[in-house]
Amino acid sequence: MISKLIIVLASVLSFAHAVADKWFYSIVIDAGSKGSRVIIFKWQPETSLPRKTIQIPIQVAAKAVNPGLAAFALDPTSVKDPMKEIIDFAVDVLEPLSSVYDLIPVYLKATAGLRDLIPTARDAIMRETINFISNYSPFYFKPDQALVISGEEEGAYGWLTVNALKGVLGKDSGESTYGIIDLGGASMQVSFVPEVNHYVLQNCYPLTLTDQTTYRLYAKSYLHYGIVEANRRLAANIITENILKVDSVDVIANPCFYSGMEFSPDFATDKYKIPISVKMTGSGEFSKCVDELKRLFDKDGVQCWVRDCTFDGVYQPRLDNRHFIGAGNVGKILQIAGVPAKSSLKNVRAVASRICSMTYAQIQSEFPDESQKTQKDLCFSISYIYTLLTHGLGFTISDVSDPTQNLSQIEFTSFIDSTKVDWALGAIIYQANQQPPSTIAAYLSRTSKLDTNAVKPVVDESFKPKNRNSGTKKFEKAAIPEGAQIPNVM
């Protein structure tokens, strides 16, 4: 009996040693509103139950492919083109493990771009995508590994990403965690663990990562409050106000664009498509822009049944002094505008006012490295971010450096330690911590003679932080000039 016990213990120790030398791989396809991205992660799995350590995967390779799946609504069979490019990329990167392709899972998770489609179009795209991956991919794949995830899932995964990169997962029941505001093109997510003495009365998303670690997360997604959709809704509102004056040659003023700049607004979605040709001209008035943007957030017309509410009657726990990361387009746009990562909303307001007062020619001169669309939309974009955070979500306009203020501090960034902040890492963190030991055992058995560390990193430039020099230093130093009158808008 003792000899058998010794043999079993020796086997367990040998197995544990094997795990320390082996890497497990997974593939995540992020099917977003603007494009699809494939990200390959690796981690060293824990084989015993109950799990005591939260597994944090490492990004190995990544590639972005355009357009997004929603672009194939009229021709779903064409999804094979971006999917083939994605699968071929993963096959090449993971070539050292070609003998165990069938044990490496691939997950596709689609977000707001597909959530916003009519059901028949969404179903057709997903059906063609699942069929193609099933027939073409050599990796482990079942139909239920391709999903259109809810906005709340997206928000919860983003929260996991932020707190993993900040190194605070698994510490003191959530008190030390960060919240996240993730602003996409079509939607916006807010996720955080409220202060311990508060309840999550709605939109509760429990996350269990180990037997010792469970978080009661508040996660809420706002469809049509992404930065692209908000731009379309703003134009629709302004046109509606002027509808009696409009014909195909009328020009309507839009305060969220530079003075004198003429353009035709984009109404690419069915929800906000307007069957007339309209020209707009910018007036570059930050205060009026904020007033127009506030109308996107219904504060008075909807009953708040569960206090407290943000807008559209949506419950949100008190923000208190929770630290937040402003990610996605929040971090990206404010970095372009020259707002420091750790700054105050008062400074955001000052920079927005200054940018909106410039001409389009001045913007092109200050930001020569940015795309034409980014240049044209910068006044709108930073004004929308400011209005969303203050009027929409209720963050306080104060100097966050003042320790006497009980503030919700926001760090504006799209990257933490050079890793892009998005939901994909969080999704694979959750998946890694739910993985059955039997799957790991099968993988370890078949990779016993393989070097699982032979996979070489290959990361697309779009996944790396950009060193933006144009405009940044000037705006940091001159964001709030001495004696300047800053519009006092809330």
Tell me what each language-model feature is.
Residues T53-Q55:
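Beta-propeller domains
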Residues S26, I40, A62-S99, Y107, ...:
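Helical "lid/coupling" subdomains associated with nucleotide-phosphate turnover
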Residues W43-S48:
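Short loop/turn segments immediately following beta-strands, especially the blade-tip
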Residues M1, I486-M490:
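A positional/structural detector of protein chain ends, strongest at the extreme C-terminus
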Residues I29-R37, I181-S187:
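A short acidic Gly-Thr/Ser loop motif
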Residues V19-F24:
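Cleaved targeting-peptide boundary
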Residues I2-A18:
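Cleavable N-terminal signal peptides of Sec/SRP-targeted secreted and luminal proteins
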